[in-house]
Design a protein with these regions (language model features):
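C-terminal motif of bacterial Sec signal peptides marking the signal peptidase cleavage site
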Residues: 15-18
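Conserved functional acidic sites
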Residues: 20-259
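Hydrophobic alpha-helical targeting segments used for export or membrane insertion
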Residues: 9-13
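Bacterial N-terminal signal peptides that target proteins for export
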Residues: 1-8
Length: 259
């Protein structure tokens, strides 16, 4: 269990550093929304700043080592909530593409969250990769379900529509301290991220990984909420730990490569 202890120790240290008051969470959000950041972050967008993207610079062939998305690839996760609930999350890279309003052709990734065999949330996420290798998040079409019926589509957005801006879901070359936005649709989707480490150890039901990438996700719309996500090269997301605003753990159970 050496890997579990390593990740647990890392998270304990991070929590100890940030549990003093809401000031820490506020500082994180301020930093992600435009404070001084690492010089290595290049031109990655932050906060609500507009960004102009040339469709000619993008492809649906996503081969970023920290999150390769070849059509047919599938990840299955087990998510344990704070009240003992357990959900199954299936993420599948489809063969479909979506023409985004800003002109970029995006890969469609289908995400289904279910509980007791019934869907509770179904989402189509839209991604594309630029020439540098950054994977951009261009929007989503999401629906939440209750008793088989859609209850809300809150959180859906499309880059180029109603002021929505693209964000980066995975940098080409993640470096410690790098900060950037993942999505921006005012009042609906404003997630930010910060790279914490590129040399973690992690163990999940699917396997044990060294050299994992750890990213902290921040939600300015919900200042008390933060998550730590770990990515393994050649696989993608393997573990998400929610450490404030409640608790929870989502771990990779199986992964099938395309073909």
């Amino acid at each position: 269990m050496r890997s579990f202890q390593a990740i647990a120790i890392t998270l304990v240290v991070l929590l100890a550093a940030g549990c003093n008051s809401n000031d820490s969470a506020s500082a994180d959000a301020d930093r992600a929304q435009g404070g001084a950041g690492s010089s290595s972050q290049g031109d990655l967008p932050r906060g609500s700043e507009p960004v102009k993207l040339d469709p000619a610079d993008f492809t649906t062939r996503i081969d970023n080592p920290y999150w390769p998305m070849a059509p047919g690839a599938e990840w299955v996760y087990r998510e344990a909530g704070p009240e003992g609930t357990e959900q199954r999350v299936e993420v599948t890279v489809t063969n479909r593409t979506e023409q985004i309003a800003n002109g970029i052709e995006a890969m469609v990734v289908h995400d289904v969250v279910s509980e007791d065999g019934q869907p509770v949330e179904v989402t189509d996420d839209w991604y594309a990769q630029d020439k540098a290798g950054n994977v951009w998040y261009l929007g989503e079409d999401t629906a939440e379900y209750e008793n088989g019926k859609v209850t809300t589509r809150s959180g859906s957005f499309e880059t180029g529509v109603d002021g929505a801006q693209a964000g980066v879901i995975m940098p080409a070359d993640p470096q410690d301290g790098m900060a950037y936005r993942q999505e921006y649709y005012k009042g609906e989707a404003e997630d930010e991220a910060e790279v914490l480490s590129t040399d973690e150890q992690v163990e999940v039901p699917f396997g044990y990984f060294k050299g994992a990438l750890m990213i902290k996700d921040l939600v300015p719309l919900e200042p008390k909420v933060s998550e730590y996500k770990l990515y393994a090269q050649g696989v993608g997301p393997v573990l998400t730990v929610k450490t404030s605003g409640g608790s929870g753990r989502e771990e990779l159970v199986s992964y099938s490569r395309a073909g």
